């Protein structure tokens, strides 16, 4: 049975719209759901997040919006530190209207999570510190600060322009990989696309994800395969090819190394 976390165990009253719940570090947590929404910002470390059956690696700068009806869990954690902004109900905001539009824009799309750069993360931290310092009865100030948090995240989402400093280009590149991992990747062409030296490309992906570029792409492909194995009736060989693997035997070996279970066993 999936555990359900209740708002009454976190919020001070039914009218309180948001509350901060830091996790430093986040512990392994089994699959669960809530009767409130949650905005999660990864501050440090790494781990695997499984949202509605779809696994995804976490690393600093990842942002995701989790709705009450979603079910998710954390595993394979390595000093993972999170800032969780719990949202009791959009209707509890007195001054912010239609905030669900902003929040829904931050909802993960399977392999693709939102990313913010280091400068934005530091600015958001300063806003959250102010929220923590203000009495919860000061609704206007708190809601203004929360709106600034959402606006900052929205303003620094992925584009594939190849503009900006090295960090901005690097994060654009990672988001591109998350949306195109099933394709054959030519790393020289990708480096040129995002105006990065090839060594910088390799170094940046390694520093952000903890994996070499090719290993990171393999993990993205395996995550998509995991989801399709659990929630579709597609043939295993077809899943392997659709996710970017050219050899089904190699796919099976990689899958078992990643999830400690063979693709066929996952379907039993």
UniProtKB/Swiss-Prot annotation:
<keyword id="KW-0805">Transcription regulation</keyword>
<dbReference type="InterPro" id="IPR009057">
    <property type="entry name" value="Homeodomain-like_sf"/>
</dbReference>
<feature type="site" description="Interaction with sigma-70">
    <location>
        <position position="247"/>
    </location>
</feature>
<dbReference type="GO" id="GO:0005737">
    <property type="term" value="C:cytoplasm"/>
</dbReference>
<comment type="subunit">
    <text>Binds DNA as a dimer.</text>
</comment>
<dbReference type="Pfam" id="PF12833">
    <property type="entry name" value="HTH_18"/>
</dbReference>
<feature type="DNA-binding region" description="H-T-H motif">
    <location>
        <begin position="236"/>
        <end position="259"/>
    </location>
</feature>
<dbReference type="InterPro" id="IPR020449">
    <property type="entry name" value="Tscrpt_reg_AraC-type_HTH"/>
</dbReference>
<dbReference type="Pfam" id="PF02311">
    <property type="entry name" value="AraC_binding"/>
</dbReference>
<dbReference type="GO" id="GO:0003700">
    <property type="term" value="F:DNA-binding transcription factor activity"/>
</dbReference>
<keyword id="KW-0238">DNA-binding</keyword>
<dbReference type="InterPro" id="IPR011051">
    <property type="entry name" value="RmlC_Cupin_sf"/>
</dbReference>
<keyword id="KW-0677">Repeat</keyword>
<feature type="domain" description="HTH araC/xylS-type">
    <location>
        <begin position="171"/>
        <end position="268"/>
    </location>
</feature>
<keyword id="KW-0963">Cytoplasm</keyword>
<dbReference type="GO" id="GO:0019299">
    <property type="term" value="P:rhamnose metabolic process"/>
</dbReference>
<dbReference type="InterPro" id="IPR018060">
    <property type="entry name" value="HTH_AraC"/>
</dbReference>
<keyword id="KW-0684">Rhamnose metabolism</keyword>
<dbReference type="GO" id="GO:0045893">
    <property type="term" value="P:positive regulation of DNA-templated transcription"/>
</dbReference>
<dbReference type="InterPro" id="IPR014710">
    <property type="entry name" value="RmlC-like_jellyroll"/>
</dbReference>
<feature type="DNA-binding region" description="H-T-H motif">
    <location>
        <begin position="188"/>
        <end position="209"/>
    </location>
</feature>
<keyword id="KW-0010">Activator</keyword>
<dbReference type="InterPro" id="IPR023609">
    <property type="entry name" value="Tscrpt_reg_HTH_RhaS"/>
</dbReference>
<protein>
    <recommendedName>
        <fullName>HTH-type transcriptional activator RhaS</fullName>
    </recommendedName>
</protein>
<keyword id="KW-0804">Transcription</keyword>
<dbReference type="InterPro" id="IPR003313">
    <property type="entry name" value="AraC-bd"/>
</dbReference>
<dbReference type="GO" id="GO:0043565">
    <property type="term" value="F:sequence-specific DNA binding"/>
</dbReference>
<dbReference type="InterPro" id="IPR047220">
    <property type="entry name" value="RhaR_RhaS-like_N"/>
</dbReference>
<comment type="function">
    <text>Activates expression of the rhaBAD and rhaT operons.</text>
</comment>
């Amino acid at each position: 049975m999936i555990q359900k976390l209740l708002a009454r165990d976190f919020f001070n009253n039914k009218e309180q719209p948001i509350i901060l719940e830091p996790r430093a570090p986040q512990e392994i947590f089994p699959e669960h759901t809530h009767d409130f929404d949650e905005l999660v910002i990864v501050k440090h470390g790494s781990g695997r997040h499984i949202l509605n059956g779809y696994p995804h690696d976490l690393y600093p700068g990842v942002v995701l919006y989790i709705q009450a009806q979603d079910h998710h869990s954390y595993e394979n954690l390595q000093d993972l530190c999170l800032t969780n902004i719990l949202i009791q109900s959009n209707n509890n905001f007195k001054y912010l209207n239609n905030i669900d539009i902003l929040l829904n824009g931050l909802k993960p799309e399977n392999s693709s999570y939102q990313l913010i750069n280091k400068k934005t993360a530091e600015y958001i931290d300063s806003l959250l510190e102010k929220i923590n310092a203000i009495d919860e009865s000061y609704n206007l100030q708190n809601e203004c600060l929360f709106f600034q948090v959402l606006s900052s995240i929205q303003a620094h989402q992925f584009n594939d322009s190849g503009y900006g400093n090295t960090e901005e280009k690097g994060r654009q590149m990672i988001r591109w990989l998350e949306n195109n991992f099933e394709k054959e990747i030519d790393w020289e062409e990708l480096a040129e696309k995002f105006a990065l030296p090839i060594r910088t490309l390799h170094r940046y992906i390694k520093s952000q994800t903890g994996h070499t570029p090719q290993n990171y792409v393999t993990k993205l492909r395996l995550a998509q395969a995991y989801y399709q194995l659990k929630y579709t009736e597609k043939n295993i060989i077809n899943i392997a090819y659709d996710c970017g693997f050219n050899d089904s035997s190699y796919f099976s070996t990689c899958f078992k190394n990643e999830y400690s279970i063979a693709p066929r066993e996952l379907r039993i």
